[in-house]
Structure formats: structure tokens, C-alpha cells
């Protein structure tokens, strides 16, 4: 867990989500909106997150609905282009998540020299997209081949919107994932983005893997972040940071980051850190 303090330079780091809009090949992509426009919007959101004071940023293809288990080349290529063009503006640690495709996430992290990545790297799940499993034995061997020794991997252990077919308790899954995969961090989520993650689940996982970073992955806002960080070591915040706290507008378009909302949550976090001193 010491790696997080070394990387983010603070206790209880807050990672802000940078949601990319629909990309070429995605059903929601509008071809009149060029990649140049997506780059411009991504840069705007990035600067709003940094201005608001987050400790890290996680870039994902949030609007590539429906998500692919085996991502098309164009999707990860578009992500790499956007990240490459805004990278000079990234002044804090950053990570990537090519949603639902662990291999694409790892390859992308290598290509853009990310500090960390997040994904569904382990387990067997069922959801709207059907049945899928994840083979971290191949993934970790690929990580070795790519010499990604410094890349930190944050594992979902109860992915949003899908059900884990593993009948073991979440605490057993947490222990096993850390032991077998050497997970650098475990992300604990609610059933969907923006929904409040159960404090009891956070405590359960943290008690099971006391020496591993545990992140509150959904539903964090100023009124709840103090309680979440009693059990979690860090938090990933996405929906709350957006204008009016909405993931998307009435037309299904990506909503922009509001730096004032970022500052509001971070002010609470600064006080939490003072209380820890």
C-alpha cells in the first residue's frame, strides 16, 4: 500500500475520472464530431479536474456502449491518440481503463506510459453482455513481457452492473486475488456508476486485505466521502464531479467536469487529511 503514498504524495488520494466520449466505431459516435473535438473536450475535463485539486486522473472509454470484451483496434487506438495529445497537460499521476478488456487496458497503459490501470482482470461474471471470464495468468505474463514493472493494477472485485458467479464471500475473493494475482489495489463498487458503495463492503474487504490498497469506486460525494474514507484508502470519483452530478445528458452525451464540484469534494478531503495528522 505504500506505493500509493509514494505515487500520489498524499494520504487518502482522490482519483478523478476523465470519461471520453463515444469513439469511432462506437454506436453513439457522431462522425460530424471529429477526434479533434474529442481531444479538445478531454483536455477541458482534464484541466478542470487538475484545477479542482484531484490527486490523480483515470481515463476511460466510458461512452463506448455497449462495452466489448475484445475491444476493436480502433477503440484503443483512438484512446491512445487522445491521451497522447493531452499528455503534456497531465501534471498528476494518471491511469487508464479500456472498459471490459483487460488486455487492451494493459497494452494501452504501456503505449501511453500510464502510472496505473484499472479493470476487470479476474473472476467470472454474467450481465447484459453475457458470460465472461478473465485469465490473469496470461495478463500478468504479458505485463512481464512488456517490462511494466512499475505499472500498478487496480482490480475490480465486484464489477458494476454484473454479477460475480464465484460463490465465495467477497473477503475470500479479496484475499485470493491479492495472493494469486498480486493485485496492487482492489476497487469496491455499487451496482452502477454514481451509486453509493456499501460502507460494510468496504470494511469487509479492508479487514480481509489490510496491507493492500482498497478504493471506494462509486458514489462518492461531499456528504459521503468522510464515511467512505474511514474504511477505504482512496476513492475514484466520476459522476459527482460532472455538471449537476449527471453522467450523461438527456441525449446520452457525455457531461463535462465542473471544477467547482471537484473543489467542493476536495475541501472535505483536505480536512480529513488534517484530522489524520
What are the residue ranges of the model-derived segments?
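Alpha-helix-loop-beta-strand connector modules within alpha/beta enzyme cores
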Residues: 10-11, 16-17, 68-96, 134-154, ...
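Active-site mouth loops of central-metabolism enzymes
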Residues: 19-44, 94-101, 155-171, 220-221
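Catalytic cores of alpha/beta
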Residues: 96, 101-114, 172-174, 208-237
Amino acid at each position: 500500500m505504500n506505493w500509493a503514498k509514494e505515487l500520489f504524495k498524499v494520504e487518502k488520494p482522490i482519483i478523478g475520472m476523465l470519461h471520453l466520449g463515444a469513439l469511432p466505431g462506437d454506436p453513439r459516435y457522431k462522425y460530424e464530431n471529429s477526434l479533434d473535438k474529442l481531444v479538445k473536450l478531454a483536455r477541458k475535463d482534464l484541466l478542470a479536474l487538475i484545477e479542482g485539486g484531484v490527486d490523480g486522473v483515470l481515463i476511460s472509454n466510458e461512452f463506448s456502449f455497449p462495452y466489448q470484451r475484445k475491444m476493436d483496434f480502433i477503440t484503443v487506438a483512438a484512446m491512445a491518440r487522445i491521451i497522447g495529445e493531452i499528455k503534456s497537460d497531465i501534471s498528476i499521476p494518471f491511469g487508464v481503463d479500456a472498459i471490459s478488456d483487460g488486455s487492451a487496458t494493459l497494452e494501452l497503459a504501456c503505449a501511453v506510459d500510464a502510472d496505473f490501470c484499472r479493470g476487470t482482470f479476474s473472476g467470472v461474471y454474467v450481465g447484459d453482455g453475457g458470460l465472461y471470464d478473465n485469465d490473469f495468468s496470461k495478463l500478468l505474463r504479458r505485463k512481464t513481457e512488456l517490462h511494466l514493472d512499475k505499472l500498478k493494477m487496480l482490480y475490480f472485485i465486484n464489477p458494476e452492473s454484473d454479477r460475480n458467479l464465484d460463490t465465495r464471500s467477497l473477503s475470500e475473493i479479496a484475499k485470493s486475488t491479492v495472493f494469486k494475482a498480486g493485485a496492487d489495489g482492489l476497487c469496491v463498487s455499487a451496482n452502477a456508476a454514481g451509486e453509493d458503495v456499501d460502507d460494510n463492503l468496504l470494511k469487509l474487504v479492508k479487514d480481509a486485505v489490510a496491507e493492500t490498497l482498497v478504493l471506494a469506486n462509486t458514489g462518492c460525494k461531499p456528504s459521503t466521502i468522510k464515511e467512505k474514507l474511514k474504511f477505504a484508502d482512496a476513492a475514484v470519483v466520476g459522476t459527482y464531479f460532472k455538471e449537476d452530478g449527471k453522467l450523461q445528458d438527456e441525449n446520452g452525451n457525455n457531461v463535462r467536469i465542473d471544477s467547482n464540484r471537484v473543489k467542493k469534494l476536495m475541501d472535505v478531503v483536505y480536512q480529513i487529511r488534517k484530522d489524520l495528522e
